[in-house]
């Protein structure tokens, strides 16, 4: 189940996220949904993304800078 991203900075493109064991599903403000996995984006990046998602700040910036095109699949 996707959880609303806290967006503490107030200007994130991330709207919702779902944390799964080896991956994350991210919904952006344009309604697109991407799945990032350990295999596609590296386990270290997925771990960092999970921490940023829970913290509610920095996830969109991290994705843009580090894993933007390294998704496993576009869902929507």
Where are these regions (language model features)?
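A charge-rich, low-complexity, intrinsically flexible signal that marks solvent-exposed coils, linkers
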Residues: 2-76
